[in-house]
Design a protein with these regions (language model features):
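Extracytoplasmic substrate-binding proteins
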Residues: 77, 88-179
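Short, solvent-exposed loop/turn and secondary-structure capping segments
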Residues: 35-39, 100-103, 182-184
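Flexible loop/hinge segments at secondary-structure junctions
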Residues: 36, 153-156, 187
């Protein structure tokens, strides 16, 4: 509900989130990327891993202490999280977890399932969810529309019949001595296909 308004018709057992939110903890880089796209990094007070973080502004926020590292999934620093007192925590319910202890902190946990999307535009559309949270629905819709238009414009360059020979792509990563390959019906497979 809009911040400062009384919710009506919502059962008492439901958790009410007031928007626009003032602060949030992001558990994945995809969640964080939506705040970057919306120009709302000032609302991100906590993040997990910074291994794949290449955003200069967020790295500066981490160095200055405006945003804190909260640990990794399954091993969160609840004291740090409580000291930040975020309005909510965006979680990935199908990852390693460790959210049981966070539930005891009393901060709403909101599932963000963007990484389960099977298409690049499906993932990009989660910017609309963040737009709702930060009270910028129109900007989020415009942001997504611009992403979709540019994506489809680039995709058209490699449409069937426009590319003589398509490369074969094997993608994945080495982790813990095992090679993890991208599935043929995955987000990345669709991205490679659309790229030609």
């Amino acid at each position: 509900v809009r911040r400062g308004t009384k919710p009506s018709g919502i059962p008492g057992s439901y958790t009410v989130i007031e928007t626009p939110i003032r602060s949030v903890v992001c558990m994945t880089s995809l969640q964080l990327s939506n705040f970057i796209k919306m120009g709302e990094l000032d609302k991100v007070v906590g993040v997990t891993s910074t291994r794949h973080l290449f955003n200069r502004e967020m790295n500066e926020r981490l160095k200055s202490g405006k945003t804190a590292k909260i640990g990794i999934e399954g091993n969160f620093d609840n004291e740090v999280i409580m000291s930040m007192n975020p309005d909510l925590i965006l979680v990935s319910p199908f990852k390693r977890g460790g959210y049981e202890t966070l539930k005891d902190v009393g901060i709403p946990l909101i599932p963000h399932l963007g990484y389960k999307e099977m298409t690049p535009l499906g993932q990009a559309e989660w910017v609309k969810f963040v737009g709702l949270l930060v009270g910028q629905e129109q900007k989020a819709n415009e942001t997504f529309d611009a992403i979709a238009a540019r994506y489809n414009e680039l995709k058209e360059l490699t449409a069937e019949g426009k590319v003589k020979k398509r490369p074969v792509v094997l993608s994945g990563e080495m982790r813990g001595g095992n090679w993890y390959a991208v599935g043929g019906e995955s987000f990345l497979a669709q991205l490679f296909k659309d790229a030609g």
